[in-house]
C-alpha cells in the first residue's frame, strides 16, 4: 500500500513540475514579447523625439479595431523594405493587455522590426492631449517629422504618393541611390 501511495504522489509531483515548467516557459515567452512593445505613458513622446533628434521619421497611431490601419501598415512595410533607412514608430491606441495581439498583427503586416508602443494610461485622453491637442483619437493618425521635427499630421488612409513625396523631401533614399 505504501508503494502505491508513493507512486501516486510521485506521479502528481511529476505533473506539478511539468505544469510549473510550462507556466515558466509561457511567462518567459510573454515577457519577451511584451518587451518588444513598450508602454506609452505621459512623457513617452519626448523619449521618441529625443531618440531621433535631427532625424526624420514617421509616427503612426493605430488600433486593432481600425478599418484602414491594415492597409496603411502594409503600405508602410513595403516602403520600409524599399527604404531601409526609413524610421517608423508604431503606437497602438489599444491597451497593454492587448500586447500579444498587437505583436501578432504587426508581424502579419511586416512591421515587427519597427519600434512599437502601446497606450498605458488609465485616461488615454491625457495622452492624446499631450501628443496633439487637436487629435480626438481617430486612427490611423500619422505624423511626418522632418529633420527639425516640424511635423505634418494626417488622419485616415494616406496614399502611397504622399509617402513617397515625403521620403524624397526628407532625403530618405532607397538602396542604390
Name the predicted role of every residue range.
Residues 30-49, 113:
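N-terminal "domain-start" segment that seeds a small globular fold
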Residues 66-69, 142:
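The canonical Cys-X-X-Cys-His
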Residues 51-67:
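Short active-site neighborhood of thiol/selenol oxidoreductases, capturing the structured segment around
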Residues 106-139:
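Short, internal strand/loop/helix patches
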Residues 71-109, 124-127:
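Structural microenvironment flanking redox-active thiols in thiol-disulfide oxidoreductases
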Residues 17-29:
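Bacterial N-terminal signal peptides
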Amino acid at each position: 500500500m505504501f508503494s502505491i501511495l508513493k507512486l501516486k504522489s510521485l506521479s502528481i509531483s511529476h505533473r506539478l513540475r511539468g505544469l510549473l515548467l510550462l507556466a515558466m516557459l509561457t511567462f518567459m515567452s510573454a515577457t519577451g514579447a511584451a518587451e518588444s512593445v513598450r508602454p506609452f505613458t505621459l512623457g513617452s513622446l519626448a523619449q521618441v523625439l529625443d531618440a531621433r533628434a535631427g532625424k526624420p521619421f514617421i509616427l503612426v497611431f493605430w488600433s486593432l479595431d481600425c478599418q484602414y490601419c491594415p492597409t496603411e501598415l502594409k503600405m508602410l512595410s513595403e516602403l520600409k523594405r524599399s527604404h531601409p533607412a526609413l524610421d517608423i514608430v508604431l503606437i497602438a491606441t489599444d491597451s497593454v493587455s492587448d500586447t500579444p495581439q498587437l505583436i501578432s498583427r504587426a508581424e502579419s503586416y511586416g512591421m515587427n522590426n519597427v519600434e512599437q508602443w502601446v497606450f498605458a494610461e488609465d485616461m488615454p485622453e491625457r495622452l492624446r492631449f499631450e501628443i496633439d491637442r487637436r487629435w480626438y483619437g481617430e486612427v490611423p493618425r500619422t505624423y511626418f517629422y522632418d529633420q527639425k521635427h516640424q511635423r505634418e499630421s494626417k488622419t485616415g488612409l494616406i496614399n502611397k504618393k504622399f509617402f513617397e513625396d515625403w521620403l524624397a523631401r526628407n532625403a530618405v533614399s532607397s538602396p542604390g541611390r
